[in-house]
Amino acid sequence: MLLPPIYYHHFQRCIPYVRALKLQEAIHALQLQQRSEFPASHQDILLLLQHTPVYTAGRRQTEADTAQERARLTALGADFVLAQRGGELTDHGPGQLVGYPLLDLERTSGAARGTRAYVERLQRVLALHLGEAHGLVTTPSEHMGVFLGARRKVASVGVQVRHGLTTHGFAMNVTREPLGWFGRVVACGLPDVEAVSIESATGREQRVGSEVPGIVERFGRVMEREMVPLEEGSGELAKLVHTLEQEFRGNERTLSSS
């Protein structure tokens, strides 16, 4: 059966994490409603963006567990959010390409429908991109994410699947900017692992926006789906996405300058 395309949208401005999370929840609810009322009518989408500085904790951590860290990290000027994704404490911010695929895994068949297989495909997208676009060799790891050596992590993966619909996703360090923020925490609960970026690994200046076309192409290749840009005015999904884009129109930090 020919599967419908995956739409994608690349935000041109840095988006606060909480606002992007609210968008994901709205899209998830829309997909669930449309799938119930008109099966196969709902659209899958890949959101690509940068966040303003934020530390996020995974669903296994609680307010009590993170109270001291929250106070310390917010004093540095970052937001702090408890998220309903897998994984532990991590950082998002400028210089990092974040991807939120909102997909219906029930559209796939067999073992590919499972969460583990989905996570493996996300990691494959990132590994392919790093190898083909930058000549970087990734290292298999028992830990979730993408590594350039046993102790050098360049990308994180943390997902949530409800009713077969995915939220959250991946974050890939592009410039050196995220590394300073990572240096203030034990990221992902791995004290012996350091955060690296494409820029630090290659020794060449990188721009986040330049990574988007390659990630989109390889995402479609691994998922075996056509990738189509989300056009403004093309239904409820587009309305939700472009409303958020307009909301942060005045944000000084844009992907074109990163």
Language-model features, listed with the residues they occupy:
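N-terminal lobe of the biotin/lipoate ligase/transferase fold
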Residues: 1-154, 205, 239-258
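Active-site donor-binding loop signature of nucleotide-sugar glycosyltransferases
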Residues: 13, 159, 200
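Short, acidic Gly/Pro/Ser/Thr-rich loop/turn segments
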Residues: 55-56, 164, 179-181
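Residue-level recognition of well-ordered beta-strand positions that form the cores
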Residues: 100-102, 158, 171-173
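Glycine-rich, charged/polar anion/phosphate-binding loops
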Residues: 153-161
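Conserved phosphate/anionic-ligand binding catalytic regions in large, soluble enzymes, centered on
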Residues: 163-176
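C-terminal accessory segment of soluble enzyme catalytic cores
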Residues: 179-258
